Amino acid sequence: MSPYAIGVGDFNEDNRLDIVITNNGIEDIGVLLGYGNGNFENPIMYRTGSHSSISVAIGDLNKDHRLDIVVVNNDTGSIDILLGQHDGFLSQTNYPTGSNPQSVAVGDFNNDTRLDIVVVNYYSDDVSVLLGYGNGSFAQQANYSVGSRPLSVAVGDFNNDTRLDIVVTNSGSNDVSVLLGYGNGSFAEQTRYSVGSYPHSVVVGAFNNDTRLDIVVANWGSDNVSVILGYGNGSFAKETRYSVGSLPKSVAVGDFNNDTRLDIVVANSRSNDVSVLLGYGNGSFAEETRYSVGSTSSSVVVGDFNNDSRLDIVVASWRSNYVSVLLGYGNGSFAEKTRYSVGSSSSSVVVGDFNNDTRLDIVATNSDSNDVSVLLGYGNGSFAQQANYSVGSYPQSVAVGDFNNDTRLDIVVANSDSNDVSVLLGYGNGSFAEQTRYLVGSVPWPVAVVNR
């Protein structure tokens, strides 16, 4: 058994967060209902008919104010829909997709106020669009060709006609496919735009302040990012590439010089640094400025750690035992890193206010020491010494949320070697109760918190 993804939501309408886990290796997913005190019931298993459920999305698909579940099955080339009831979920309804579906997004593609689904199919080089009837059921898929080996999908209105369009990264053909929506649930034939080598992830945003959506793509294989400016009519300019470090792994955006223009920060896993690219507000970016961080930079997050209204950066470094904090000067430059010790092999980092003092704190997962490190912020950009809390074996991902409705942030961690998740309840003073472990199968990896 190999659980792949974790989602969190209130599935039984008791105002208590529950957990859903997809499993790779058995034909079931597990739902763990929360008691509202940070504890959970034993999992209730729902059959999917797939041995490889690799992704999950949550939403109200039939407009009954109850959360439903969408599961991507990459071995059977299908998705499963499980409609939520007050006392659980109906048996899954299976909808065929293309071959080896990888990622899923939802949106209203035919302007009927009902959620629809788009799925990226890696081996069949297409996307499947399934229109929702508003009762939790979906029409048969309509497939649209894209490039080779598509991996990731995002949606947005690229031609300002109030109709959602689709953009897909194609890792095998080194381009992105843009499919314009007609507003009736169908899409025009793709238009392809070249990007760098092995494009993996895609984000949309307005980088030249013209209210027209643009595209930025992380090119894992060519050590750069591609920025593609939109004309607002559904077409895009030729890419402009900006060099970053070696093997960029994680990207975040924010306004680092307080000029109301979006900037980019990239964590480079091989060159052990971050690249900051300042935006000119016209869609172009200055040459990168590199800041040294730890070995094998694996995760980057931005936030204001010293309450000066200037964005700062925190980076987790997988082959080192610390996180690096770079304070922003508000002019686009950053102070030299300050390192804070954490456990062994920090793989993921998130921020939150764990002691309710309006100052951001840090939590990092430590894969080799089997714990998480919590560093409380002083509000001046510095942090207290780590407090470590044991979790399961080889923790890989972390998320935060209030699991017991006490207005205090709690922590959930996916442990890939012990096949479980750890929930640590927060006391609201920056400390946490001992973990409670919940068995989920084997090799849980990503974890996320989803609130309706």
For each feature predicted by the language model, list its residue ranges:
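Beta-propeller blade termini
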Residues: 4-11, 33, 54-61, 102-109, ...
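Beta-propeller blade repeat segments, especially FG-GAP/WD-type strand-to-loop junctions
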Residues: 29-45, 79-93, 127-139, 176-188, ...
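Hydrophobic beta-strand segments that make up the repeating blades of beta-propeller
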Residues: 19-22, 69-72, 117-120, 144, ...
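Surface loop/turn motifs at the tips and blade-to-blade linkers of beta-strand repeat domains
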Residues: 1, 46-49, 94-99, 143-147, ...
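Glycine-aliphatic tripeptides that mark coil-to-beta-strand junctions in extracellular
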Residues: 15-17, 65-67, 113-115, 162-164, ...
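Blade-level signature of beta-propeller repeat domains, shared across WD40, Kelch, NHL, RCC1
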Residues: 79, 83, 439, 443-452
